[in-house]
Amino acid sequence: MKFNKLNLSHCISFYISEVSEVFFESINQHPSRDFVNNILQKIKTTLSEEELEKLNSIEEVTKDEKIVIMLNHVLKKIVSKTGSSKCDLFNVIKQDRFNSPVYIQSINAFENNLINNEFAERRYDYLIEVNKNSYLKKFVNSIRISFFLDLRAQILSGSFTLNLVNKSIEKQKKTEIFKDIFVNALVKHFICNQLYPISLNSFIFDSENPSNKLALKERIKLLKTNWNSLFFDKFYNCLNNKNKQQLQETSDEMFYAVINTYLIMLISVEELRVYFTSKEPALILKVLDKKNTLREDPDQNPETDLYELIQFIEQNYLKKDKKTSWNKKKVQDLEQLLEEINKINLETKNESLAYPDEITELEIDNDNFVSTKQVFRNQLELQLLHGIVINPEKYGIGMWSSYFADWSEYKNLIEQMLNPKSGNDFYQFEKDIDESICQINKKYLTFISSDSNTFLIVKNDDVKVISNYVWAQLFFETRRWIINDIEFDLYEKGFDKSHFSRNIALLESLSFSWLDPFYGLTSIKEIMQKIDSKSNLKTSIEEMVNRFKHEQRINKKDNERVLMIFAYIAAFVVGFINFFSMVFTILTVSDLNAGLTVPNIIVISIASVLAFILIVIAVLFRFKWKHIKH
């Protein structure tokens, strides 16, 4: 069977909370298109100039072309800080009306029909193409930004899709695709074990503290040392190339390409956060939609680009009033360093990114995909590709593998598996296929890993299906990400009773049923059902809601117990006052012995016994209360 093309992408999700209500009040988001297109035009004629300007500003803030202006502005700043006069990091798509370069374009992956148009207005999809002459090309071909304004949860759910491999394999050996998969698995392993948590604070500390400036250089030096150690040990030393200088240059370029790409994504997220949490986004647009002249930095290398990006982040996104410092003496190894970073992340509100999920797309010469057995039978390369993508741990290249196989070990295993005499068990392979199958279509087959973080798409060359998986992952991963954040706060800070109602409301807004519109994309429902069967996300949300409600009920009972304590104390005080009032009323006479009559003594004795019982009840209640709390 002929392999035509390989695409390998990483999907990295994020979310932005506390989105300004302005974006959900926009007329463009109104569910009735008849209202927008007809009635609104009539209303406009009756409005004053001030009211009309306000209405227009509400309409403008969510328009696709305005979001392009906002994102392109930050890309222009990035370009001015990086690259060289002859080679920008990104391709220029066109020139705007001010004759300035535009580096980002809107892409319409789905048709806007009447049924899903309401949701289409809240879906945004953009593409940034990397300059083929840029060092970023060593790592990524293009960056796709997709996000959705979630009205129910009042959040922005988004993801970056990094296209890492996009090559024709018609004139190459099929085994070359396994090399591409290995290298990108190694990059993913590094990111998840060295860069996580993926946030601004993973790279940057307080610039006003001189010791932290030194710490930043040490941090980058440590990352680069670990990168070189990993790549030379696992890959470069296993190659026949003996030119160490050339390998070192390749390794350095790849390192800076990876780090700078992630910084660019974090900058983009911060720009989205600033815009979508603003109470006056129209003012931001007015400032941006003007001719801006940005100073071009002189020609520089990838390392200088890294420090320029960090300086840009320090000046624009890190809080000036927040002293985020770290204990330099305490940090002795990477684990302690990550612990310090986690502490700083808790103190700031900068956004972070999730683990990279993987989508591998293979185009083959095949006209009928109805039968998985027919497609895979006697196709050892295809069977092996399925195994490596869906179960990478078995081949020693898993994201969390405690031991990551080197290239020689991996290559020998590949050659062994591709040997027809090795006696591969097709029956066991069929079981793996049945467990991982996601969709069966005449034009394609798709598969999902057991942790629902990896997809394999096998298709012919005339069908586009990857967008369905990008949006399905976006829907699920942002929800998983929010739940993880809630759980992290829960276990790190304990049950904060003041947040019960807010957490319950947020979780209920994230819950879903299979009758939901799913961003207006009915084509992703089947994919999400399969993801949920692996991850149990739907059930997890419901269980967490029930847990918070249970804790809320316990908290309510605790409050009732506290009120009961106050009631007992009040009764105790009132009882004692009445008791002594009665005693002094009886005894306060001119003749003391006159008050000591039998009836009075009986009354005083009974009152004393009752007072004693009240004291005993209060003491026992106090001890029991302490026992319950502990």
Curated annotation (Swiss-Prot):
It comes from the Bacteria. Keywords: Cell membrane, Membrane, Transmembrane, Transmembrane helix. The chain crosses the membrane at residues 254-274, 504-524, 564-584, 601-621. Disulfide bonds: none annotated. It is found in: Cell membrane. The keyword Transmembrane applies. Its main location: membrane. GO terms for cellular component: plasma membrane. It is a multi-pass membrane protein. This is Uncharacterized protein MG242. It comes from Mycoplasma genitalium (strain ATCC 33530 / DSM 19775 / NCTC 10195 / G37) (Mycoplasmoides genitalium).
